[in-house]
Amino acid sequence: NDIITLTGNPDNPVRKSPHKPYIIDSMDNGVCSLTFMRAFDNAEIRVYQNGILIEQDSGFFAEGETYTLDLQGYGKGEYTIEVHYRNNKILSFFEEI
Protein backbone atom coordinates (compact mmCIF):
# COMPACT_ATOMS: atom_id res chain seq x y z
CA ASN A 1 0.00 0.00 0.00
CA ASP A 2 1.20 3.46 -0.87
CA ILE A 3 1.01 6.19 1.72
CA ILE A 4 -0.01 9.58 0.40
CA THR A 5 0.63 12.61 2.56
CA LEU A 6 -1.43 15.71 1.94
CA THR A 7 -0.12 19.04 3.12
CA GLY A 8 -1.70 22.48 3.17
CA ASN A 9 -5.35 23.42 3.29
CA PRO A 10 -7.85 22.56 0.60
CA ASP A 11 -9.12 25.51 -1.41
CA ASN A 12 -12.77 24.56 -1.00
CA PRO A 13 -13.41 22.54 2.13
CA VAL A 14 -16.43 20.26 2.04
CA ARG A 15 -18.98 21.23 4.64
CA LYS A 16 -21.54 18.71 5.67
CA SER A 17 -24.36 19.67 7.93
CA PRO A 18 -26.65 16.99 9.28
CA HIS A 19 -30.16 17.25 7.90
CA LYS A 20 -32.58 18.06 10.68
CA PRO A 21 -36.14 17.18 9.89
CA TYR A 22 -38.70 19.92 10.40
CA ILE A 23 -41.23 17.45 11.77
CA ILE A 24 -40.76 14.03 13.34
CA ASP A 25 -43.70 11.67 12.89
CA SER A 26 -44.51 8.55 14.85
CA MET A 27 -47.40 6.13 15.12
CA ASP A 28 -48.32 4.06 18.16
CA ASN A 29 -51.51 1.98 18.39
CA GLY A 30 -53.36 4.17 15.92
CA VAL A 31 -52.26 7.46 17.50
CA CYS A 32 -50.15 9.64 15.22
CA SER A 33 -47.80 12.19 16.76
CA LEU A 34 -46.17 15.06 14.89
CA THR A 35 -43.37 16.82 16.76
CA PHE A 36 -42.38 20.16 15.28
CA MET A 37 -38.63 20.74 15.34
CA ARG A 38 -39.01 24.39 14.37
CA ALA A 39 -41.84 26.89 14.68
CA PHE A 40 -44.40 27.26 11.90
CA ASP A 41 -46.62 30.33 11.99
CA ASN A 42 -49.42 28.95 9.83
CA ALA A 43 -49.05 25.26 9.06
CA GLU A 44 -51.92 23.09 7.87
CA ILE A 45 -52.38 19.43 8.79
CA ARG A 46 -54.53 17.25 6.53
CA VAL A 47 -55.60 13.68 7.19
CA TYR A 48 -56.98 11.48 4.42
CA GLN A 49 -58.66 8.10 4.94
CA ASN A 50 -58.75 5.96 1.80
CA GLY A 51 -58.11 9.12 -0.26
CA ILE A 52 -60.89 11.22 1.34
CA LEU A 53 -60.08 14.28 3.45
CA ILE A 54 -61.43 13.54 6.95
CA GLU A 55 -59.64 16.09 9.13
CA GLN A 56 -58.01 19.45 8.55
CA ASP A 57 -56.42 21.76 11.10
CA SER A 58 -54.18 24.79 10.86
CA GLY A 59 -52.45 27.18 13.17
CA PHE A 60 -49.24 28.14 14.88
CA PHE A 61 -47.01 25.29 16.00
CA ALA A 62 -44.15 26.12 18.35
CA GLU A 63 -40.72 24.51 18.23
CA GLY A 64 -40.90 21.30 20.27
CA GLU A 65 -44.71 21.16 20.21
CA THR A 66 -46.33 17.77 19.59
CA TYR A 67 -49.64 17.47 17.75
CA THR A 68 -51.51 14.17 18.14
CA LEU A 69 -54.18 12.56 16.00
CA ASP A 70 -56.16 9.54 17.21
CA LEU A 71 -56.88 7.67 14.00
CA GLN A 72 -58.45 4.68 15.75
CA GLY A 73 -61.67 6.65 16.15
CA TYR A 74 -62.04 6.67 12.37
CA GLY A 75 -61.70 2.90 12.09
CA LYS A 76 -59.53 0.72 9.92
CA GLY A 77 -58.22 2.07 6.68
CA GLU A 78 -55.33 3.59 4.79
CA TYR A 79 -54.34 7.00 6.11
CA THR A 80 -52.23 9.72 4.55
CA ILE A 81 -51.08 12.51 6.84
CA GLU A 82 -49.78 15.71 5.24
CA VAL A 83 -48.39 18.95 6.60
CA HIS A 84 -48.45 22.01 4.35
CA TYR A 85 -46.62 25.27 4.93
CA ARG A 86 -46.80 28.30 2.63
CA ASN A 87 -48.45 26.23 -0.11
CA ASN A 88 -45.72 23.57 0.04
CA LYS A 89 -46.17 20.02 1.24
CA ILE A 90 -43.39 19.60 3.81
CA LEU A 91 -44.41 16.19 5.16
CA SER A 92 -46.43 13.31 3.81
CA PHE A 93 -46.58 9.78 5.12
CA PHE A 94 -48.82 6.76 4.85
CA GLU A 95 -50.13 4.48 7.59
CA GLU A 96 -52.52 1.56 7.55
CA ILE A 97 -54.45 0.58 10.65
Regions found by a protein language model. Give the residues of each.
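Structural beta-strand segments of beta-rich domains
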Residues: D28-L34
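Edge beta-strands of extracellular beta-sandwich domains
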Residues: N88-I97
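Conserved aromatic beta-strand anchor motif in extracellular beta-sandwich/beta-rich domains
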Residues: V47-Q49
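Generic short beta-strand
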Residues: E44-I45, I81
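Short proline/glycine-enriched turn/loop motifs at strand-loop junctions of beta-rich domains
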Residues: M37-N42, Y74-K76
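Short, surface-exposed loop/turn motifs with a glycine/proline- and acidic-biased composition
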Residues: F60-E82
